[in-house]
Amino acid sequence: MKRNNGLRMLAAQIASFLKNNTTKRLTLALVVAVTFLAMTASASAESLKAFATRAGNETGTNTHFLVDLDNSSHTSLAFSTSTTNSLIKITYNAECGVLGPPESWLSVTILVDGVQANPASGAFFGFCTSLPNGVDYQWTGATRQSLIRVPNIGAHFVQVLVDINYGATNWWLGDSSIVVEQQ
């Protein structure tokens, strides 16, 4: 009888061990699966809608103009949306320099279908600024990222409006790229 009780106790311990380990394994597998799903569900995946690059430099003294977005002198970039109220992210970057008195600057404004994207700061978004001496460029690799909700499905276009401000006399924009993404 003593031996049977010992075997029963051993069998109960083995069953308990297997049950606990199975529960732990199932719990771990469930935690891993939920974590993976949470990571993929909460990731902010954007899809590339359009892009353009321009190699080389543009320089001038003009203001309030649309900058070339590629080497073919296109000042707009087309993209399309397939859902209403699409959240669009535009990233524009270029090497930038400006001449003028202290505190003068070059600004870029991102337009989608002629509407200013956010932050809608007009000519007050300083893309690059002048040096205090007014005769040397302060070269800057600058980036402007903007967001806008596009209400309609279909074809759209993005443009970059450039202004020189506060007495700036000359601007320079080097190699550039623009990327349009949709969330």
State each model region's role.
Residues 1-23:
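N-terminal secretory signal peptides that target proteins for export/translocation
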Residues 4-5, 10, 26-27, 56, ...:
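Small/flexible residues
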Residues 20, 41-183:
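Extracellular jelly-roll beta-sandwich "head" domains, especially the C-terminal globular C1q domain
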Residues 29-38:
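Bacterial N-terminal signal peptides
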